Amino acid sequence: MKKSILLALFTLVSFVTTAQEVKWMTMKEAVAAQKKNKKPIFIDAYTVWCGPCKMLDKNTFSDPKVAETINKKYNPVKFNAEGNEEIQFDGKLYKNPAYQEARKTSRNAVHEFTYFLKVQAYPSMAIMDSKGVVTNSIIGYHTPAQLLPKL
């Protein structure tokens, strides 16, 4: 009996936890989703070495109200601004030609898509309309209370 109750409780907690996470997509997935649901794209431009970026993940994007708001209003994309991902967007291929695999866990070259987004600092969040225009940029670490009104 105790095992059944514990199992049920664990299952419930697991379900609630996963329901409160931002459902990140690739840029390709977000563009495809946007064609169907007409929601803007929310892009979190981060780097692997950025302390405030990690705090944003841990403290802000994990907040149930923030996650719910982002999932409801946007097609969310998590983008490594110094990563090696190739992004096909609006008829153009964006790459990071100077990317160095040996530096993948530290500072690296800036991705071409980062320049397209006009990222000035990390972390940066960009909201993009259906025409591919960045309509709003949010720069720096924000607590849930600070970020929610901007969403």
Predicted regions and their residues:
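Bacterial Sec-dependent N-terminal signal peptides
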Residues: 1-21
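Non-globular targeting/processing and membrane-anchoring segments
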Residues: 20-23, 35, 116-118, 129, ...
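Short gly/ser/thr-rich secondary-structure transition/capping motifs
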Residues: 22-26, 58, 106
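A short beta-strand-turn-helix
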Residues: 23-41, 70
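Thioredoxin-like thiol-disulfide oxidoreductase module
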Residues: 29-31, 64-134, 149
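Short active-site neighborhood of thiol/selenol oxidoreductases, capturing the structured segment around
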Residues: 37-54
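The serine-hydrolase catalytic nucleophile loop
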Residues: 56-62
